[in-house]
Amino acid sequence: MKRALISVSDKNGIVPFAEKLVELGVEIISTGGTKAAFEQAGVPVTGIEEVTEFPEMLDGRVKTLHPAIHGGLLARRDTAEHMEAIAAHNIKPIDLVIVNLYPFQETIQKPGVTLEEAIENIDIGGPSMLRSAAKNYAAVTVVVDTADYDAVLTELQEHGATTFETRQRLAAKVFRHTAAYDALIAEYLTNITGETFPEKVTFTYNRKQVLRYGENPHQDAAFYTEPGTIENSISAAKQLHGKELSYNNIRDADAALKIASEFTEPVAVAVKHMNPCGVGVGENIEEAYLKAYEADETSIFGGIVALNKEVDAKTAEHMSKIFLEIVIAPSFSEEAFAILAKKKNIRLLTVPFAGNMEGFEKTSVNGGLLIQANDSLVEDTTSYEVVTEKQPTDSEMKALLAQWKIVKHVKSNAIVVGSDKQTLGIGAGQMNRIGSALIALEQAGEKAKGAVLASDAFFPMDDTVEAAAKSGITAIIQPGGSIKDKESIAMADKYGISMVLTHVRHFKH
């Protein structure tokens, strides 16, 4: 290895790396700020303009886009015609390229960033050099990740060159890196144009964790996160205690966070298998947790609990009495953390809560991808319609609105029975609506008397209303829209139940 081209925005570790290369007899070629850093550190360096015999121009936009650079990168060492061609133009082969790119992601995440600032942080020369070097990985070693410095240096020190396998691995990483970089730029500019569903989409994710296994032990899995921090998301969670999250933990935690984010008042959400098993609302977080626990004392065991306020010592004492997989909250008091951390198998996570979740959700299907807006519509309750003779009382309306927030997060067909403070029965995932209703009503038992019922979609028949009435339900909220709405309304009137139509459906598959 005779010649290395180094141009980096992240200068961590680059000076000692270059010093080792010089000790191995490698000539260093560099640009701009990287060259200045080498000169300041006393590392011998050749400026890029000495190689190209052309000055940097356009405020640094054009530095390395030159045949003297790309010829030295792309020439096949095993092809005589290539080597003769670059020799004829006094172009020397470049054997090692170390480049990382302008910080586009960090730039667009800055508050108040302008379009001009974003544009100026779109790297052109860097990706071009990386791609040229990666294409010719048979001869050229290319490094885009500072984490690879030590491994490359070790091979050079021990063997005088890198192995083919190493170069191939590094080239693959480069193409992943440049593809992700371009995808981020494309997404940023597409969002500016307001185009929701462009003809092509490319998403970039960063691997956060290789998981022990997936949904089942025979399935391999990993967890990838979107670039940047998305508040009130599991990808933004910080783990304070416990072993690594599993695939199922992550999915359940995501479901719990989505429900907890619906509420501004203190709420506790218990989830099992991506469905809520208990949701409690209170004047404080202790009361909210106790309501969630009372909602289903059996199912909460081994569950995931998300709370939207700091966990205090009293709440932690209650939680410590049962086995919980995960507790997620904005924060834990010192006393609460000390209490819960005594339990070896519990995982404690903090997540920044910032209101409702917006954006888009993606679902894979064989051979494709479905993309839709998150079900985060802020509904205009003034458009809700009371269609029965009986009007809901203020307390009933408060309970209806609370359960309406919850039912949209339950797998369809979804029925939730509850009060303004807690769920009392949840029927999820049945293939017919009456089936889900009967499950929810049976779970609620005697507590259904005086409670309300929420349905994620319309009633195809009046049987759910009749079952609710016979269990003591006093008010129902549902979207409406069935050809048999009149029959359901008539059944409600027959039993003196109030019914509110929202005209918004909340299927969840």
Curated annotation (Swiss-Prot):
MGS-like domain: residues covered: 1-144
Keywords assigned: Hydrolase, Multifunctional enzyme, Purine biosynthesis, Transferase
Domain of life, per UniProt, equals Bacteria
- InterPro entries given for it? AICAR_Tfase_dup_dom_sf, Cytidine_deaminase-like, MGS-like_dom, MGS-like_dom_sf, PurH-like
> Which molecular function term from Gene Ontology is one that the record holds?
IMP cyclohydrolase activity
Describe which pathway this protein belongs to, using the record's wording: Purine metabolism; IMP biosynthesis via de novo pathway; 5-formamido-1-(5-phospho-D-ribosyl)imidazole-4-carboxamide from 5-amino-1-(5-phospho-D-ribosyl)imidazole-4-carboxamide (10-formyl THF route): step 1/1; Purine metabolism; IMP biosynthesis via de novo pathway; IMP from 5-formamido-1-(5-phospho-D-ribosyl)imidazole-4-carboxamide: step 1/1
Record EC number: 2.1.2.3, 3.5.4.10
Catalytic activity reads: (6R)-10-formyltetrahydrofolate + 5-amino-1-(5-phospho-beta-D-ribosyl)imidazole-4-carboxamide = 5-formamido-1-(5-phospho-D-ribosyl)imidazole-4-carboxamide + (6S)-5,6,7,8-tetrahydrofolate; IMP + H2O = 5-formamido-1-(5-phospho-D-ribosyl)imidazole-4-carboxamide
Q: Which SUPFAM superfamilies match?
A: Cytidine deaminase-like, Methylglyoxal synthase-like
- Swiss-Prot/TrEMBL GO biological process terms: 'de novo' IMP biosynthetic process
**Gene3D superfamilies according to UniProt:** 3.40.140.20, Methylglyoxal synthase-like domain
Listed GO cellular component terms? cytosol
- NCBIfam families, A to Z: PRK00881.1, purH
Q: What is this protein called?
A: Bifunctional purine biosynthesis protein PurH
The organism's taxonomic lineage, starting at the top: Bacteria, Bacillati, Bacillota, Bacilli, Bacillales
Gene name of the record: purH
